[in-house]
Amino acid sequence: DNNPAGSFNVFDFAWNIVLDPSNLNEDEMYMATYGSILRSVDGGESWLEELGGGNAYYNNVEITTDGIVYATLSSEGTGKGIWRSADGMEWTNIIPDGFGNVYGRTAIGINPSNENEVYFLTAETENSGQYTNTFFGGETWTSLWKYTYLCGDGNDSCGNWINLSANIPANRPTTFDNFNAQGGYDLLVKVKPDEPNVVFIGGTNLWRSTDGFTSDSNTVQIGGYVEGSDHGYGNWDIYSKHHPLQHDLLFLPSDNNIILSANDGGVYKSTNCMASPHLWYS
C-alpha cells in the first residue's frame, strides 16, 4: 500500500504458494512471484529468493509429497527455464532441447500416483509446439511435455522428456473448439490420482485424455464452450452448467472421480469425471 504510484514489489504479483508437506521441523513454503521463486522456512515471516532475475513475468512452482520442487520462469528473465530441486536451495534447469526460446506461463501437473512424472503445459511458445487458430482471428502456440525423473539431478540422461504438443486439440471444426490459453490467462494440466493415463488440460475449454495425450484420438471436450460454437450472435453457447476459461481442477481425496472445476464462472462439481457427455453441478 505504500508503494509509489507506478511501482510495485514482488509480492504485488504472487502467482501461487505451495507448502512442503515433507518438512516436519519447519513451516516451509514457496511462492511464485514476479521475477522470482521465493522460499520461506518460518511460515512466510521472511523470504529468500531462490530462483529468478530480470523480468520473468509468468512464474510457477509445485512440490511433491516428499519435497521435490519444480518451478518454471517465463523467458523474459535471466533465470528462465524449467527447474528442479531436492531441497529448494540447489536447483537444476532441466528444460529439454527443442522446447523453444520464447515461452510464457507454464502450468505444472505432477502425477500423484508416480511423482517422478510431471506434465508441463506452456502458453505462447512462439514457433514451437502446437499452432492453433483462435476465435476473433487470433492465433497461438502451445506446448505440452511430459517429464520423467530417472536419477541424480534429473537433467540430461537423468531425465526423460516426451513432446506431446502435437496432440493438443487443434484444427477442430471451429476456432472456439481449438485449444486456447489466451496468453496464459486460462491454463491448467492435471493428472487423475488413481489413473495416470487420464490427463486433463484447460484453456478456454476443458479437455480429458485417456492416453496421457500420447495421441489425439482419445481426447474429449468436457467443459467450456459448447462444441461447434462460432462467431456471431446466437452462434455460440457454453457447456451445460459449466463455463469457459479454466483455472484449476481438484480431485476429491476420498473419491477421485469427483472433481471441482474452477473457471471464470465460479466453481463447478462433477461426480464422474470420466463421463461423456459430462454432467456438471453449479
Please annotate each region the language model reported.
Residues 1-282:
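Extracellular glycan-interacting surfaces
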